[in-house]
Amino acid sequence: MDKFTTLEGVAAPLKIINVDTDMIIPKQYLKTIKRTGLGKGLFSEQRYKDDGSENPDFVLNQPAYRNTKVLVAGDNFGCGSSREHAPWALLDFGIRCVISTSFGDIFYNNCFKNGILPIRVSQEDLDKLFDDAERGANATLTIDLPNQEIRGPDGGKVKFEIDPFRKHCLINGLDDIGLTMEKKASIDTYEDKLKRERAWA
């Protein structure tokens, strides 16, 4: 998992509340267990028309937001059914941070496991970030995880809270396997001790 310290990039405004995981990645893309290639399915029912052509009105199809790294979204983002493909699709598209007032619990947890930073902010702060994100090509936000703050294009700052353990994992790029390997020396020491004490086993 890639480390997450400071992220600077274009932020796209998605002013829709209750975006569920089926909207993020529709069910027809769930057949694969690969984490790559799912970016094409991200918001596919909003990004594409019935004939397969792009919907120019959807924010991620607009030139200023095609390479967005940050998504500023409406309340209760990622609600609905459990599907880890949702953060996979966001990550494959290039999005590493989602900012909202609240998230679906399972989606929120899955984001951390896949190297995406979900940030909860107040409605007042979200409205300010929407204003920043609506600047198009100038909608650059800086996400400073070590200092737990979001910096806008005009230098304005929004502070955010994060669980210290999850912060540690993101900064060091630790997924479940990485966490285990971080404790490898302790595990090896314990196993050696066990072998000595239970040589008969």
Curated annotation (Swiss-Prot):
Q: What class of enzyme is it?
A: lyase
Instruction: Write down the superkingdom of origin.
Output: Bacteria
Keywords, comma-separated and alphabetical: Amino-acid biosynthesis, Branched-chain amino acid biosynthesis, Leucine biosynthesis, Lyase
A Pfam family this chain is assigned to: Aconitase_C
EC number per UniProt: 4.2.1.33
The UniProt catalytic activity note for this protein reads:
(2R,3S)-3-isopropylmalate = (2S)-2-isopropylmalate
What are the record's GO terms for cellular component? 3-isopropylmalate dehydratase complex
Q: Which CDD domains match?
A: IPMI_Swivel
Chain coiled-coil ranges? none
Assigned protein family = Belongs to the LeuD family. LeuD type 1 subfamily.
Q: What does this protein do?
A: Catalyzes the isomerization between 2-isopropylmalate and 3-isopropylmalate, via the formation of 2-isopropylmaleate.
HAMAP family noted in UniProt: LeuD_type1
Name the record gives this protein: 3-isopropylmalate dehydratase small subunit
Q: What is the species listed in this Swiss-Prot or TrEMBL entry?
A: Bradyrhizobium diazoefficiens (strain JCM 10833 / BCRC 13528 / IAM 13628 / NBRC 14792 / USDA 110)
Recorded name of the encoding gene: leuD
